[in-house]
Amino acid sequence: MARKVVQHRIVDLTLLLIVVAIATTLRSALWPTESEAVANVITPIGGVLQSWQQHIPVLSAILWAFTMCFVGLGVGRLGVRYSIYPAYTIMGIPIFAVVAACIVGSTEYMVLAVLALVMYLATKSMTRFIMRTERFGDLSLAMLYLGVLPLILAPAALLYVALPLLVLFVRASWRDLAVAVASLLLPLFAICYWNWCAGGCFMAPADTIYSNLLTVSEYRFFESLNFVTIILIGIVIVMIACAVALTVSDRYSIKSKSRVVLRFNALLMCVLMGLFALPSATSALFVLIAFPVAVVVPLFFVRMGVGFTETLYRLMLLAAAVNVVLMAF
């Protein structure tokens, strides 16, 4: 007998995403917490974006809200478009919204918007590479986008080391590894070459990125959490744990390519969570983490019992709403 799956309507989830985008952006703009006001460590692209926001602060907030809606709908549709899950689900939309904006936000909206857009394009290209084409062009494009992230956010520089290992783990081919490494380092090489053409040292941008990785920011992860935030994170972690367990144990209803996508995103999620241990970490990392979480967690809603999944989902939304209100006071 087929397992019953609750079909959440696209209209309802879209309205939820819009409400979350508007509410969280207004709240962080009008009543930011101390942890949200912590500036990101200046990077080659991130510094430019921070400078732009100083000139257009209101437009930056609006851009972030629109970008959140756009990429939220996009990442939610990946499962349907590429048939990642055994049944139809677009639950990646609310999961992305909650993780990206309802736990701890940031006031650097221009940086958040560009991070979200680049990460979405990388996730989309990587999913297309694994599920459909298996062409080097899509793998190269995904790694190219991921290689831009350290130029925007300082702690993401650790991806230069971690991503080749992840690619080798899910695609045991030296050709894939060579393409991934070359594409991943291309944005950094371009910045170094540009600096050399301008009369500077060729390796100066790379040295700057390394020093930025170790620069201490004023953000403290545990100090940014309240009781409701801890509950919200706990609910999301339970969903993640169930989805990962299903990925490992369910070998019949999940396609082999889908399992590769879920495995890659689960490992990437672990790496991104580990970036909070770096001294340069800020709350902007939640935007990056939201993408692999939004790809992995929908399996939880497809394969687990309806009563359990709906209860956790409603508790998550309730905790997210209460957390947004509490952070305003």
Question: What are these language model-derived features?
Answer:
Residues 245-305:
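Membrane-water interface signatures at transmembrane helix termini and the short loops
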Residues 75, 79-99, 117:
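Transmembrane-helix signature of polytopic, membrane-embedded enzymes
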Residues 39-55, 206-230, 242-246:
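Juxtamembrane membrane-water interface segments that cap and precede transmembrane helices
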Residues 63-74, 115-118:
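Transmembrane alpha-helices of multi-pass, membrane-embedded glycan-processing enzymes
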Residues 93-113, 125:
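Aromatic- and kink-enriched transmembrane "portal" helix at the membrane-lumen/periplasm boundary
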Residues 121-137:
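Membrane-interface transmembrane helices that cradle and orient dolichyl/undecaprenyl
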Residues 159-185:
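Perimembrane helix-loop-helix junctions
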Residues 138-152:
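Membrane-interface alpha helices of multi-pass inner-membrane proteins
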